[in-house]
Amino acid sequence: MAPKAKKEAPAPPKVEAKAKALKAKKAVLKGVHSHKKKKIRTSPTFRRPKTLRLRRQPKYPRKSAPRRNKLDHYAIIKFPLTTESAMKKIEDNNTLVFIVDVKANKHQIKQAVKKLYDIDVAKVNTLIRPDGEKKAYVRLAPDYDALDVANKIGII
């Protein structure tokens, strides 16, 4: 049985060769160049087509180390305010008053108070004083008492 299989194998390349030859003959007669229509341009300005722009793949990073975050939790909150009006806020409104970094925003102040004093913050109001410092009114969550927290951190 094996010799018959060997005899059948050479036949297909002959058929393929014949088909290839016919295809070549047809191409010679007809011509391989297709007749592409020329695009009619309606504008005098030529807009260059958008080409593929590959992303940069640098051989080495341009910065040796990432920049250190200078505005960490300890830098954001400078000190608590202990004025009479601040004490009134602690007693009446469940609010602590801090002097904070001018560049800090409300979210950063909230996170800093949460981390440093382990308390939940309801909301933060800020203002910039005439002397250029930023004051933050930190309203505590209802389940925390501002008077207890003030005692713990040493305001009172």
Swiss-Prot record:
The modification N6-acetyllysine is found at K70. Residues 32-74 are annotated as: Beta-like import receptor binding (BIB) domain. One of its GO terms (biological process) is translation. The modification N,N,N-trimethylalanine is found at A2. N-terminus is methylated by METTL11A/NTM1. Citrullinated by PADI4. The modification Phosphothreonine is found at T45. The gene is RPL23A. The modification Citrulline is found at R41. Keywords: Acetylation, Citrullination, Cytoplasm, Isopeptide bond, Methylation, Nucleus, Phosphoprotein, Ribonucleoprotein, Ribosomal protein, RNA-binding, rRNA-binding, Ubl conjugation. This is Large ribosomal subunit protein uL23. There is a cross-link at K14 (Glycyl lysine isopeptide (Lys-Gly) (interchain with G-Cter in SUMO2)). The keyword Nucleotide-binding does not apply. Component of the large ribosomal subunit. The ribosome is a large ribonucleoprotein complex responsible for the synthesis of proteins in the cell. Binds a specific region on the 26S rRNA. May promote p53/TP53 degradation possibly through the stimulation of MDM2-mediated TP53 polyubiquitination. GO terms for molecular function: rRNA binding; structural constituent of ribosome. PROSITE patterns: RIBOSOMAL_L23. It is found in: Cytoplasm; Nucleus. Belongs to the universal ribosomal protein uL23 family. Residues 1-19 have a biased composition (Basic and acidic residues). The modification Phosphoserine is found at S43. Signal peptide: none annotated. Residues 1-67 are annotated as: Disordered. InterPro entries: Nucleotide-bd_a/b_plait_sf (IPR012677), Ribosomal_uL23 (IPR019985), Ribosomal_uL23-like (IPR013025), Ribosomal_uL23/eL15/eS24_sf (IPR012678), Ribosomal_uL23_CS (IPR001014), Ribosomal_uL23_N (IPR005633). The N-terminal beta-like import receptor binding (BIB) domain mediates interaction with IPO5, IPO7, KPNB1 and TNPO1. Component of the large ribosomal subunit. Interacts with LYAR and GNL2. Interacts with MDM2; this interaction may promote MDM2-mediated p53/TP53 polyubiquitination. Directly interacts (via BIB domain) with IPO5, IPO7, KPNB1 and TNPO1; these interactions are involved in RPL23A nuclear import for the assembly of ribosomal subunits. Interacts with IPO8.
